[in-house]
Amino acid sequence: MDYNIELYKKDSKNEYRYALGVLSERTLFVIGLNPSTADEQSPDPTIRKVMGFAERNNYTSFVMLNLYPQRSPYPDDLPYEADKDELKKNITIISDLIKSQKEANVLLAWGNNVYSRAYLLESLNLIYKNAIFSNH
Protein backbone atom coordinates (compact mmCIF):
# COMPACT_ATOMS: atom_id res chain seq x y z
CA MET A 1 0.00 0.00 0.00
CA ASP A 2 1.44 3.33 -1.06
CA TYR A 3 1.39 6.37 1.21
CA ASN A 4 -0.69 8.77 -0.89
CA ILE A 5 -2.71 10.74 1.64
CA GLU A 6 -5.78 12.48 0.24
CA LEU A 7 -7.61 13.14 3.51
CA TYR A 8 -5.73 15.18 6.11
CA LYS A 9 -7.78 17.10 8.63
CA LYS A 10 -5.90 19.11 11.24
CA ASP A 11 -6.05 22.45 13.01
CA SER A 12 -4.17 25.49 11.73
CA LYS A 13 -1.30 25.04 14.22
CA ASN A 14 -0.99 21.30 13.54
CA GLU A 15 -1.48 20.57 17.24
CA TYR A 16 -4.59 18.51 16.56
CA ARG A 17 -5.09 15.91 13.83
CA TYR A 18 -8.59 14.63 13.23
CA ALA A 19 -8.18 12.32 10.23
CA LEU A 20 -5.43 10.96 8.00
CA GLY A 21 -5.82 8.60 5.07
CA VAL A 22 -7.75 7.88 1.91
CA LEU A 23 -11.39 6.98 1.35
CA SER A 24 -12.14 4.21 -1.15
CA GLU A 25 -14.69 1.46 -1.75
CA ARG A 26 -12.92 -0.72 0.83
CA THR A 27 -11.60 1.56 3.57
CA LEU A 28 -10.47 0.39 6.99
CA PHE A 29 -11.20 3.00 9.64
CA VAL A 30 -8.77 2.72 12.54
CA ILE A 31 -9.44 4.52 15.81
CA GLY A 32 -6.37 4.92 17.97
CA LEU A 33 -5.79 6.78 21.22
CA ASN A 34 -4.24 10.00 19.91
CA PRO A 35 -2.17 11.01 16.88
CA SER A 36 1.61 11.00 17.00
CA THR A 37 3.83 12.46 14.27
CA ALA A 38 2.39 11.21 10.95
CA ASP A 39 1.28 13.84 8.46
CA GLU A 40 0.31 13.96 4.79
CA GLN A 41 3.96 13.54 3.74
CA SER A 42 5.38 10.94 6.14
CA PRO A 43 3.96 8.01 8.10
CA ASP A 44 5.02 7.24 11.66
CA PRO A 45 5.46 3.68 13.06
CA THR A 46 1.78 3.39 13.98
CA ILE A 47 0.63 4.38 10.49
CA ARG A 48 3.08 1.92 8.91
CA LYS A 49 1.55 -0.85 11.06
CA VAL A 50 -1.96 0.24 10.08
CA MET A 51 -1.01 0.23 6.40
CA GLY A 52 0.41 -3.28 6.68
CA PHE A 53 -2.64 -4.56 8.53
CA ALA A 54 -5.01 -2.98 5.99
CA GLU A 55 -3.10 -4.40 3.05
CA ARG A 56 -2.85 -7.92 4.54
CA ASN A 57 -6.61 -7.87 5.07
CA ASN A 58 -7.46 -6.77 1.52
CA TYR A 59 -8.44 -3.17 2.24
CA THR A 60 -7.67 -0.67 -0.50
CA SER A 61 -7.21 2.24 1.90
CA PHE A 62 -7.27 3.31 5.53
CA VAL A 63 -8.33 6.34 7.52
CA MET A 64 -6.66 6.89 10.88
CA LEU A 65 -8.82 8.51 13.52
CA ASN A 66 -8.31 8.93 17.26
CA LEU A 67 -10.26 9.13 20.49
CA TYR A 68 -8.58 12.46 21.21
CA PRO A 69 -7.04 14.55 18.42
CA GLN A 70 -4.12 16.18 20.25
CA ARG A 71 -0.76 15.20 18.78
CA SER A 72 1.75 13.60 21.13
CA PRO A 73 4.05 10.63 20.69
CA TYR A 74 3.59 10.08 24.44
CA PRO A 75 -0.02 9.47 25.54
CA ASP A 76 0.97 10.16 29.16
CA ASP A 77 1.57 13.78 28.09
CA LEU A 78 -2.09 14.28 27.17
CA PRO A 79 -3.88 16.83 29.36
CA TYR A 80 -5.94 15.60 32.29
CA GLU A 81 -8.88 17.69 31.10
CA ALA A 82 -10.01 17.54 27.47
CA ASP A 83 -10.54 20.60 25.34
CA LYS A 84 -14.30 20.14 24.93
CA ASP A 85 -14.40 22.05 21.62
CA GLU A 86 -11.67 19.87 20.12
CA LEU A 87 -13.33 16.73 21.42
CA LYS A 88 -16.67 17.75 19.89
CA LYS A 89 -15.03 18.63 16.56
CA ASN A 90 -13.22 15.28 16.55
CA ILE A 91 -16.42 13.30 17.20
CA THR A 92 -18.23 15.21 14.43
CA ILE A 93 -15.46 14.51 11.90
CA ILE A 94 -15.32 10.82 12.84
CA SER A 95 -19.09 10.48 12.63
CA ASP A 96 -19.29 12.23 9.27
CA LEU A 97 -16.50 10.13 7.75
CA ILE A 98 -17.86 6.80 8.93
CA LYS A 99 -21.42 7.67 7.93
CA SER A 100 -20.21 8.71 4.47
CA GLN A 101 -19.45 5.09 3.65
CA LYS A 102 -22.06 2.57 2.53
CA GLU A 103 -20.31 0.01 4.71
CA ALA A 104 -17.71 0.90 7.34
CA ASN A 105 -15.20 -1.47 8.91
CA VAL A 106 -13.78 -0.02 12.11
CA LEU A 107 -10.75 -1.31 13.99
CA LEU A 108 -10.29 -0.11 17.57
CA ALA A 109 -6.58 0.04 18.30
CA TRP A 110 -5.14 1.12 21.63
CA GLY A 111 -3.75 -0.36 24.82
CA ASN A 112 -4.42 0.22 28.49
CA ASN A 113 -3.69 3.94 28.13
CA VAL A 114 -7.36 4.37 27.25
CA TYR A 115 -8.02 4.27 31.01
CA SER A 116 -5.52 7.04 31.77
CA ARG A 117 -7.93 9.90 31.02
CA ALA A 118 -11.69 9.80 31.63
CA TYR A 119 -12.40 11.74 28.45
CA LEU A 120 -10.91 8.96 26.31
CA LEU A 121 -13.67 6.59 27.37
CA GLU A 122 -16.20 9.42 27.01
CA SER A 123 -14.99 9.90 23.45
CA LEU A 124 -15.31 6.18 22.73
CA ASN A 125 -18.87 6.23 24.03
CA LEU A 126 -19.77 9.22 21.83
CA ILE A 127 -18.21 7.61 18.74
CA TYR A 128 -20.10 4.41 19.48
CA LYS A 129 -23.41 6.27 19.79
CA ASN A 130 -22.96 8.81 16.99
CA ALA A 131 -20.98 7.05 14.31
CA ILE A 132 -20.63 3.34 14.56
CA PHE A 133 -24.06 2.19 15.66
CA SER A 134 -26.32 5.02 14.55
CA ASN A 135 -28.56 4.65 11.54
CA HIS A 136 -26.89 5.77 8.33
What annotation goes with each model-predicted range?
Residues I47-E55:
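Short catalytic helix/loop segments, enriched in acidic residues and glycine
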Residues L33, L67, W110-N112:
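Short, well-ordered beta-to-alpha junction loops that form the rim of enzyme active sites
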Residues T46-I47, N90:
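Amphipathic coiled-coil/heptad-repeat helices and related helical stalk/stem segments
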Residues F29-I31, V63-L65, L107, I132:
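Hydrophobic/aromatic beta-strand patches that form the interior of the parallel beta-sheet core
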Residues M1-D44, R56:
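Active-site and ligand/interface coordination hotspots across diverse enzymes
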Residues D2, S72, L78-H136:
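Glycine/proline-rich loop-helix segments at beta-alpha junctions forming the active-site rim
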Residues E25-R26, Y59, K102-N105:
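A general structural motif
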Residues T60-D76:
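Short connector loops at secondary-structure junctions
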